[in-house]
């Protein structure tokens, strides 16, 4: 399964921004609109609530055969048997996480520059999330990555590259000359009134540059 992952439209959840009553509803609407990968990101809730939420979201992702990635929490990812885990530079080292989760699970690593990207590849990551490409309200402490840095990363790593940070419909064309594999999106999907329509439009714009 790992080699056939479609990274095109990668929803990263944020319950503080969601336009729906429940996270499950937001996730399902995004999948119906064409989301190809879901990352469950829960920074504020207890471990118990994160676990319960992950089980609910997994039911939806399984229904549509969409991979579920857990942000940061290796224990939650293993507890619910998620498809993978995404870690940042301040989380557990990627080599340690790979040894814990094994080779069959997806391992994603955030990378803000070429050195971090090359290290993630050496540490056996399956993909990297590069950014923040633009300033973003969801991660106020994120340092930005330039287009030239992104281009160099895509030329020097041999794994899928997903961009993140302030991505919206209007900005997708900025990546036309760069060989990226997907868009990791938060507010441009989950905060929209019509999540399904917003996701569909993002996917249409992404395919225009592929």
From Swiss-Prot:
Cofactor details (free text): Binds 1 Mg(2+) ion per subunit.
GO annotation, cellular component aspect: cytoplasm
EC number: 2.5.1.3
InterPro entries, per the entry: Aldolase_TIM (IPR013785), ThiamineP_synth_sf (IPR036206), ThiamineP_synth_TenI (IPR022998), TMP_synthase (IPR034291)
GO BP term, pick one: thiamine biosynthetic process
Residues that, per the record, bind Mg(2+): 72, 91
Gene3D superfamilies: Aldolase class I
Family, per entry: Belongs to the thiamine-phosphate synthase family.
Protein name as annotated: Thiamine-phosphate synthase
